[in-house]
Amino acid sequence: MDYKIVRKENQKERLWTGGVSKELYIYPDGSTINSPFNFRVSTASINPGEYNFTSFKGYKRLLILLSGSVKLEVDGRDYYLKPFSHIFFSGDSHTSSLADETSIDFNLIFKENINLLDFKIVETEFSGNSLSSKAINIFYNLEDNRHIRVNNNEYTLGKEDTLIACGNNFNIEGSGRGIILSLDIKI
């Protein structure tokens, strides 16, 4: 079992036309947003105004709004997002946002060879086991100083810290508000 914690202060920031994106994790390790990758998890601010999203041809996307309110237009259809609502859409889609206030979203961009086994927005206690030997499980913490246990080892996550656990034979449990993703890589 392999796992790591990406602390808030170690997240890679990059500007996009509508704000700032913070990369939580990209797979495989060593990939960049400008090179081929299998999946990328990030958060992004969306400033007030109207902005076009970057196109990711050949990828799928999951966006979960964390704060604020945003109107997304995806291929001409409007979606109104409030905190903790989500939307799946194609990375090929023409997508734009309209926000009256600064908003924050959580993003997963993933290729066809990635199977999203599960995603949860957790409010209190949570636990889970690896669902596959090729699974990558991600927990994004939304609260200050939450205690997480991975195979009986305890860690403290600060707000916006991310835990990544890969492989099989592990158990994760904890309490607090956050987002859990479980991804499986198809070979």
List the predicted regions and their residue ranges.
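Jelly-roll (double-stranded beta-helix
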Residues: 1-187
